[in-house]
């Protein structure tokens, strides 16, 4: 076990850094086998190392790339390339010996006329030299390339040799396939026949990928151990660790390797944050299109997954996991399961919508509203400028409301609640199948938490705190006599000098209190801004309705409600899209000032803040229409006003459900079309164009020729960096809310979500394969905090749909009328029952219509939708008993619906096991086989040991003869008695 302050404690070999003058490499007799850095200048440079996927020798694969900016000399394209390796104390600037990394066109000419560098560039160079020297000590092999087609950018290629891969795989407890293979239990009887038929039917939509084919055999996996290498299939060491695993191992080393010149920073994240390196990423396997492109996993993913032409096919999830890692594989697997589950929901939603269309002409309430013979005169919708109007003018709205406000929507709400529970259970079972296939059954998140290193910002804050503390201690020591100092304390501090700074000093809640307070105030302020914008849109609707009512055109006045609703929803949509981007940036800033210690903690806090703000932003306008519009209007003669000027708007005679449907559909479709698709396509293309134009300006005149010959790492550098899965999950979670929360008002929501997701899967796939740098593979066994958010939305959906059916729709008032007030057991007279009467002489001063004869006759009594006493009653305009009866029925429905659906959802959760039975059996079988494997290994060892001991014992025993008979066995194999002699008797 070797301990080095510049590298984490790991078993490793002692290594030395060879100093090589590339200009005179042969003079010192350097051999490739003598050191970590192998000279590759003897290789034909025209081979171009398979376009940057390998070192210059064409054998060692590039596992990772570090990118940095440098200033080129004015007269020459090449730069001196050095890596410092010094035994001086950490932080010292003295260079013991300088040596170059192997690379193209390296030179060590002292008189090369290198331009003077400023302090910051010089400091970054020294940090890079020390860090790369420490990487060499960790066992990695490096090769530098500054003679690139990108102006002012240098690349460090990193290769992990076999011994480093084995060491790190053991440290990371990576499960690797062993030689032992076993049969996967197959279904029998009827199930086997059904599965075979389904496989034949679905064969055209299966991706042509080897990893996607049904497997009958599986290799037993076990955490890699160098002591048990004989258990693993090491016949081909080059392919034993695939590119994903190799890059993960190198990234772990990069995170742990220290750089003391980076102010005690730990790992590549700190160096990236400080600008020492511009980027760090693993390479893609090669090109994905074009002629004469070598076949690779990236090309296969593009052809079978990332093209819009294969939208009808299943996703090759196993290949996605193999190339991008488990975390990204789980995201696409979850998205695929969610999209698949939307199919039955869409079918049922279409049936519900068609039922509304089929029964539209049979709906008695809408027929009564459209019947002009009823001659129902309604009260004005606004003060002064609005006049009386006929209820029959709202016929189209009433008929359209029946499409979404019918008994089938209640059934659909119950169905969608059970659908959400079934979807969650189905995903858990799918997740367990993937865990089994991907050898994650024994993987625990705690194992990753142990290796989760502090973030660069956290280390910087800890350093700042420690420096302040040290300065305060110095001030105190000035006033304390030297002889009174505690020598034991000094010894302890000296002993702790090798301990990481983040272990000695930690940030407490007191250090973070200002950030917590800022978070609280900012989030409250952002929510208040959202409410204020919704209020502004409400005022717009009211004022616009009043302005349109003054229009002389009859067509404009007849379509006031539709015009105002549509324009207001479009304004809401634009504001929501803009605020989504703003809130995303604010949530990230608020999370940064909290300074979470690890990336996992940072991600969880960011998700919570972003989801809270975006949830409020997306759903506040919908909540207003669903639960508040028309509830606090007042009555004619006693209306409620905003700012004493704007009268609260009312719902249409058919209710607010139709308006809620319009609001929900426009916002949902608009967000999906603009934010999720156009932004995802347009913004990366725009960034790519900007990078191309910058490169064209900075590059020499032969730019077009240079582009043709770019290395793989140069091409990948121009791709967009991977920013995490949070935006991808967030848009799908918000969509899931639209599908479940208000599905009672919009049965077609699952259909539009399905159509969007079919495009979304291929859009995200194409982005990952063609537009983004290859992300570092991250192990994960579930989707993390997103699962809890989904469950929370599913529970909230039951409550919200109960209130939508009960309070927003007319379902409960119709039931109450049918069973309590109807004289003939039909809905005839329901519309008249829901309307109250108002005497126009009771209008407040200045609120009566300016043109009371607009309908051609004088109006004495007008009607309005409410349950109140008539003007001829003793308690005129007071709330009637009918109101309380309907309210009691509504509350009772909410309680019954909520508890019944919750019980049914929990029952579904209980009935469906989380782990499929066959997977449970296979996991148990793996454990038994693993125990048998080790038992057999121990038996073989014991037998081998006994055989060896027997041979050793036989070597030590003297041969049997007439002179020594004590050790000679008899015919039965037992030693002869001591008194017996051969050839004689006593």
UniProtKB/Swiss-Prot annotation:
It is a multi-pass membrane protein. It comes from the Eukaryota. The keyword Acetylation does not apply. Residues 1-333, 428-519, 590-607, 679-725, 768-784, 914-986 are cytoplasmic. Disulfide bonds join 370-395, 379-862, 382-386, 651-656. Changing residue 740 to I: In MYMY7; uncertain significance; increased intracellular calcium activated chloride channel activity. Residues 79-121, 951-986 are annotated as: Disordered. One of its GO terms (molecular function) is protein homodimerization activity. Keywords: Calcium, Cell membrane, Cell projection, Chloride, Chloride channel, Developmental protein, Disease variant, Disulfide bond, Glycoprotein, Ion channel, Ion transport, Membrane, Metal-binding, Phosphoprotein, Synapse, Transmembrane, Transmembrane helix, Transport. Ca(2+) 1 binds at residues 677, 731, 760. ATP and calmodulin are essential for its activation. Channel activity is inhibited by CFTR protein and by chloride inhibitors such as niflumic acid (NFA) and 4,4'-diisothiocyanatostilbene-2,2'-disulfonic acid (DIDS). Activated by heat with activation seen at temperatures above 44 degrees Celsius. Activated by BDNF in radial glial cells. It catalyses: chloride(in) = chloride(out). The chain crosses the membrane at residues 334-354, 407-427, 520-540, 569-589, 608-628, 658-678, 726-746, 747-767, 785-805, 893-913. Residues 355-406, 541-568, 629-657, 806-892 are extracellular. Homodimer. Interacts with CFTR. Interacts with TRPV4. It is linked to Intestinal dysmotility syndrome: An autosomal recessive disorder characterized by impaired intestinal peristalsis, recurrent episodes of haemorrhagic diarrhea, and distention of intestinal loops. Intestinal and hepatic portal venous gas, dysmorphic features, and developmental delay may also be present. Moyamoya disease 7: A form of Moyamoya disease, a progressive cerebral angiopathy characterized by bilateral intracranial carotid artery stenosis and telangiectatic vessels in the region of the basal ganglia. The abnormal vessels resemble a 'puff of smoke' (moyamoya) on cerebral angiogram. Affected individuals can develop transient ischemic attacks and/or cerebral infarction, and rupture of the collateral vessels can cause intracranial hemorrhage. The term 'anoctamin' was coined because these channels are anion selective and are predicted to have eight (OCT) transmembrane segments. There is some dissatisfaction in the field with the Ano nomenclature because it is not certain that all the members of this family are anion channels or have the 8-transmembrane topology. This is Anoctamin-1. It comes from Homo sapiens.
